[in-house]
């Protein structure tokens, strides 16, 4: 009986650690990414506004340029980190469950245990995807993950660039038609610059939170799909006053990995989603796992069709 309780407690601890560690690293990545992307965008917007002032004074108007290349590079770097984190931490979690079944603790280069130093864990992940190893990381992370990231980030950066530049262009045009004198037009443009900045910052914050979740989840799914010990997932939401009904209604529900509805229930389910999928293994469910019937009644997600199909392709393409 004591041995059984020890095994159960080790499994619970591994699950708690997986959620807490993921949340902490997400927060770290999110803060760093938003800070750097805002800094890049602020400098970019200043150059756009200088260009706009010149155009207003000269009476000409040209389309503003796209986001700088280093914006895309920084976004790629963080999402690569998040993808690797999802893949590796999921891999470690399954190994910890395997050891817990034997009543033992997992001792690897990266663990999720409470006594493991947070900074050391993050440093290990960062070293794994450092620039010196960037070309070889696909030898550990499956090529499917690398290909997804290479294809996805340019599209994401393009969407953000188009969204922001279209709004900037609109403000510039409005400023050029405001007032009857050059001084009035310049004043209108400068007053609009703060609005543009706040709008851009809010967009960056939303994208950073959502896409870090997405990259992490894709890494987890690829890790799960390539591990025969994983038979399903548990949907875990961060339950607080910001949790949406979309996520709270799914919290604690289970779904088989081969359930065709999994892509529609894979985080992020909406903008700024903080939910994650926890692997369910044969060690937790030796008699098998059934999808929770409550999934028949949960509210629809706000995913883009494109993202649902990307998850579906990953699940279909990976070996079982």
Where in this protein do the model-derived segments appear?
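N-terminal leader/targeting and assembly helices and adjacent pre-domain segments
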Residues: 1-198, 281-320
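Acidic, glycine-rich two-metal-ion catalytic cores of nucleic acid-processing enzymes
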Residues: 195-295
């Amino acid at each position: 009986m004591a041995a059984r309780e020890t095994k159960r407690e080790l499994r619970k601890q591994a699950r708690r650690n997986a959620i807490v560690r993921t949340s902490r690293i997400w927060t770290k990545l999110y803060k760093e990414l938003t800070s750097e992307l805002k800094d890049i965008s602020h400098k970019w917007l200043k150059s756009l506004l200088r260009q706009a002032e010149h155009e207003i004074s000269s009476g000409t108007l040209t389309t503003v340029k796209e986001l700088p290349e280093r914006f895309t590079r920084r976004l790629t770097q963080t999402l690569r980190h998040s993808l690797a984190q999802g893949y590796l931490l999921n891999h470690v979690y399954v190994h910890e469950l395997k050891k817990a079944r034997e009543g033992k603790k997992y001792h690897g280069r990266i663990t999720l245990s409470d006594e493991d130093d947070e900074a050391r864990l993050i440093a290990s992940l960062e070293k794994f995807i450092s620039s010196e190893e960037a070309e070889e990381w696909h030898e550990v992370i499956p090529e499917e993950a690398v290909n997804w990231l290479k294809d996805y980030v340019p599209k994401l950066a393009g969407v953000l660039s188009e969204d922001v530049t279209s709004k900037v262009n609109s403000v510039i045009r409005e400023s050029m038609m405001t007032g009857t004198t050059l001084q009035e037009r310049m004043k209108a443009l400068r007053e609009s610059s703060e609005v543009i900045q706040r709008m851009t910052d809010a967009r960056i914050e939303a994208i950073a939170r959502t896409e870090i979740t997405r990259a992490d989840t894709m890494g987890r799914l690829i890790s799960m799909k390539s591990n025969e010990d994983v038979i399903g997932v548990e949907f875990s939401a961060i339950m607080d006053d910001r949790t949406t009904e979309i996520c709270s209604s799914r919290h604690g529900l289970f779904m088989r990995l081969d359930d065709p509805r999994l892509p529609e229930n894979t985080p992020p389910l909406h903008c700024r989603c903080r939910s994650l999928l926890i692997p369910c293994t044969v060690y937790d469910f030796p008699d098998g796992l059934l999808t929770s019937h409550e999934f028949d009644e949960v509210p629809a997600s706000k995913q883009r069709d494109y993202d649902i199909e990307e998850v579906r392709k990953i699940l279909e393409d990976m070996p079982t």
